[in-house]
Amino acid sequence: MDFFPMLSSLVSRCSAALALGAAAFFAPALQAAEKAFAPAIVYDFGGKFDRSFNQSASEGAEKFKKDTGVAFREFEITNAAQREQAMAQLAKRGASIIVAVGFTQASAVEKVAKQFPDVKFTIIDAVVDLPNVQSINFREQESSFLCGMAAALVSKTGKVGFVGGMDIPLIRKFALGYTEGVKFVNPAAEVFQNMTGTTPAAWGDPTKGAELAKSQFGRGADVIFHAAGATGIGVMQAAKDAGKLSIGCDSNQNYLHPGSVLTSAVKGVSVAVYKAFSDAKAGTWKPGQLFLGLAENGVDYSLDEFNRKLITPEIEAKLRQAKADIIAGKIKVTEYKAQ
């Protein structure tokens, strides 16, 4: 019997066995690496195509996917009970971070985060104090102040309006900052205010938004700022139809009605989502509270080709100076506090 063929065969079989053993040993590690990062996002009422708050969040998630090649799971709720259900299911399916868009998701985040302590949660526009939750909030009153200034600077009647969505402290922040900005320019100006409702349905009623806007226009307002989600689409359409001006909210809505949208109070929701996903992927994500204002580029007013003719160089200069003064602390914008 030839010794060398036998040795060669033995070596081959041993090598194969070692290879199989190594594969079996490393497979779980490789699988774990492949599953190491699985981001997810749960939108609030209105859905990711609301052309406002949720859409801005969606854009942040999509940008992350484009930049990194990492896909994300998402869920659009249609009723309140789905918040908790969706988050729990995403956590069970291996999500490593779940971004909850909107203050109404706070209770669901608090409950599910306790059930899944190893999953990271980021909530936008609310505070949940847990060791695995990051809370991102904005100083909406600062951008609203600038929008109020712009409204007062272009108003011919000295009367402007505000239409909010759900009557909650967050929307009162917008209203108060806006009013202070108006009064900063024209102390004698009138500011009409209406809230759409007291339930989440107030975010998705453009017909009601249009009705409220028409009422304010009828009282003499010639500029209306909305902070009402999809309801605000009706406000903006009513302004265009009446030959008046509107101010968008959350995302840059200038493009919706070029020449009719004075500006938009933009909020870095897309930035917040992108940052949450990116930090979690990089291992730099931290729980706790994060506040974003003008100084952090978290909020601002929008200026582009769609409203360039409405915001004159003189108006822009005044807004730029006010922005610098707010950042420097020379102008104090009141933050609404619930009584």
Predicted segment positions?
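Bacterial N-terminal signal peptides
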Residues: S9, R13-A27
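A residue-level marker of the well-folded mature domains of exported/periplasmic proteins
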Residues: A33-Q339
